A protein has these predicted regions:
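Short, charge/polar-rich alpha-helical segments
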Residues: 326-342
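Short terminal alpha-helical segments
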Residues: 253-310, 371-374
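Charged, low-complexity interaction regions
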Residues: 273-287, 309-311, 335-337, 352-367, ...
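Heptad-repeat amphipathic alpha-helical coiled-coil interaction surface used
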Residues: 262, 341, 345-349, 355, ...
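A hydrophobic alpha-helix/topogenic segment detector
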Residues: 179-254, 261
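Repeat-associated, polar segments at repeat-unit boundaries in modular proteins
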Residues: 307-310, 314-325, 370-383
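Alpha-helix N-cap and loop-to-helix initiation/capping positions
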Residues: 137-141, 227-235, 366-370
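A polyanion-binding, active-site-adjacent surface
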Residues: 2-180, 207, 212-227
Length: 387
């Protein structure tokens, strides 16, 4: 674990929890501390416990009231987790915001029903309402916790901050001496080319701050204003898709996923024996594992899906970009070199998702003919060129 001035990141985090708890127990705060919370925020129990190297931090406004009847199921889960029981935060939790979050994260390749060390969930305001779960948010609550939130970001050092709602965005940007215009609607802020806003940690490392709609009922209604489907998440899924290029271009992911994957594909390309094995592979016939290729392919496929590279809306993207199926199937070098980032990603997803099962070849035939390598190299080239 990285250290700052000789103090471990874990020790910094534990000291932050102690300082926040002391501030709320001082009696000078309108909001209260929740004694069941052994983390900096109750949302950490969903994604965040031990995730001090998380790359994506989800930021809400405030958690609400843990003593409210609607929070009873979650609080039982948290109490069980404090006792060392293997219980999910989301168990028996039918909160519409949380259920929508599951769907939105799934749309970018994350399964938040399981523990994911890349994610850290928190609220900007770290205290708790005595009653009521939403509405009547006070700027003074955020101002009181701004110092603590900035410390949290400096400890975790995420690449991406996902801000749910305008008040959350304004609070987060305020910690970094940045602002958001009050002259335009929040929907315009979300859709702006200036989203995300890039801020810097104290050592100059960039953090990408995304404006997103709150995915509760009211936030979803506001995001869908002017559309016929008031509770659809489609607009929000399009908003969330903008997060992926920033996530994919993370230097950590470049080193641990993109570069090793491309190296593996180049080794196959250079070996006639390995290419022949890929061409002959079938899930319906016994195969001798050639130099661990079966294991290598499984890991490659798992990592590609896990990192959200196999986008679900690839067909919609192909149609939008007028990409011809035959050209996508061949993925010839000269053509691939003309593709935009989203075009190349859509083509790669096509090769992963199209029906290989009639011949049982899975992705292997697209690897054998070099299509996957050419597309991966194109994506990598565009990612490293991102500002």
């Amino acid at each position: 674990m990285e250290e700052d001035g000789g103090v471990s990141r874990n020790d910094q985090y534990r000291q932050l929890i102690a300082d926040v708890r002391t501030a709320y127990q001082s009696g000078q705060r309108e909001l209260k501390w929740c004694d069941e919370c052994q983390e900096v925020n109750l949302w950490n129990y969903w994604q965040g416990h031990g995730h001090l190297d998380a790359r994506i931090m989800l930021v809400g406004q405030d958690w609400g009231c843990p003593w409210d009847a609607g929070a009873a199921a979650v609080m039982r889960n948290i109490q069980a987790m404090n006792c060392g029981q293997s219980v999910s935060y989301i168990c028996e939790n039918e909160n519409p915001t949380d259920r929508n979050l599951i769907e939105l994260f799934h749309s970018i390749g994350f399964d938040i029903l399981t523990d994911d060390s890349r994610l850290f969930f928190t609220n900007f305001v770290m205290g708790y309402r005595v009653k009521g779960t939403s509405g009547n948010f006070k700027k003074s609550w955020a101002m009181a916790d701004a110092e603590y939130f900035r410390r949290l970001v400096e400890i975790i050092r995420p690449r991406i901050l996902l801000c749910l709602g305008k008040d959350t965005l304004k609070s987060v940007l305020g910690c970094f001496d940045s602002t958001v215009s009050n002259k335009v609607s929040y929907n315009c802020v979300i859709e702006s080319e200036k989203n995300p806003v890039v801020v810097s940690l104290s050592d100059g490392v960039p953090v990408y701050v995304f404006a997103l709609a709150h995915c509760g009922v009211m936030g979803t209604l506001n995001r869908n204003r002017g559309s016929g489907d008031k509770l659809s998440l489609n607009r929000q899924k399009n908003d969330w898709a903008k997060v992926l290029p920033v996530f994919w271009s993370d230097p950590l992911l470049l080193n641990t996923y993109w570069e090793p994957s491309i190296k593996m594909l180049r080794e196959i390309e250079a070996s006639e024996e390995k290419r022949s094995w890929c061409k002959a592979y079938s899930v319906y016939a016994p195969q001798t594992d050639k130099q661990g290729l079966i294991r290598t392919f499984r890991q490659f496929m798992n990592d590609t899906y896990k990192n959200g590279v196999v986008i679900g809306n690839y067909r919609e993207m192909m149609n939008r970009l007028n990409l011809d199926d035959q050209q996508v199937v061949k993925a010839e070098s000269a053509w691939v070199d003309t593709l935009s980032l989203y075009g190349a990603v859509a083509c790669l997803a096509y090769h992963f998702r199209r029906d290989h099962f009639c011949e049982g070849s899975l992705i292997n035939d697209s690897v054998a003919n070099g299509c996957v390598l050419r597309l991966m190299e194109r994506i990598y080239k565009l990612l490293v060129a991102m500002p």
